[in-house]
């Protein structure tokens, strides 16, 4: 095909194009420098009549040459609905569909022309996958009207819900779940929607997914749980994802969530939350390091190490410290600040045991009973205790407020908040006293 022919195609003169086809019809499927064909040039003009003319005279709508643009994709890119319909009617190869970044009107044209809404491309992606990636709620709603399947996975094992949770789009996640999206599915890397939400989502999105999943402690292929992800990427969601059955789960390197929290950037608030919820400071990673070893290696901040030591002393007093040699750590014994702090912890616990707060119950019992309720399943004792606590809550709070127990005051206050929630379920008024 000569350059003159291309020039005349782009002129838009139908009669001139007809004359050229009549005189040079045997060249209608010949490419120019293997980069284009008469049909591709005709499509690029945006003139459906010229395109129809070429097809009528034998132009191949599925011209096979990887260097030449795909006719259907070319028509979609220039946004010509008429040419797209014309190509589809004439049997153009639709295996490229769907493609990213198609607007709502073009998708409607394609679907109305007979392409199935759940058509998969070479990567097994559907129109729904791309609409979610584009964060286009209106297109998503339209696709459901055409019967889009919410649970088709692509070659990476990603379901639509995986893409939505990576995009942190609450309304889209909500719609997918309402349409029956599976909340516990995993992609090829073992990531669940909750893994993605914990990594990329805000509190509302994580809570939404959490309300629809029955496995908060799912591990991906490298052993990471949603809680691990939250500690690394999304610390505001840590408390939401804490599950006492999985708080000590390890990844393939033997790291627990507490190990993660102790690596830079280190947040003492996150460490405090994990420890209060029974993160085990005795667990060693694959290199033989427990959390205190990790703290000395990566952080070496007195406040962090003291937080770990306070927990170790308290859990040891409860009788649940699995490795008591932690308190004999060389870095602790050789450091006057830390060894003195361990002594102060023990002294404060003695004082807690002597200080009565409700009948014969001591301040130490405030934590001890909570521990038994939380981890030993002793629910009867806590109910009796809380009924007594309800009448003595003001005095008890005052005792804690005056900071009589500087090391363990936050443990005690948190216990009271937790008790308040339990009492709320029992119909008590204590919840109102502690909710602030």
Swiss-Prot record:
Ranges occupied by ANK repeats: 1-30, 34-63, 67-96, 98-119, 123-152, 156-185, 189-218, 222-252, 253-283, 287-317
Disulfide bonds: none
Keyword Transport on entry: no
Keywords, sorted A to Z: ANK repeat, Repeat
Highest taxon above the source species: Viruses
Protein name (Swiss-Prot/TrEMBL): Putative ankyrin repeat protein FPV245
Keyword Repeat: yes
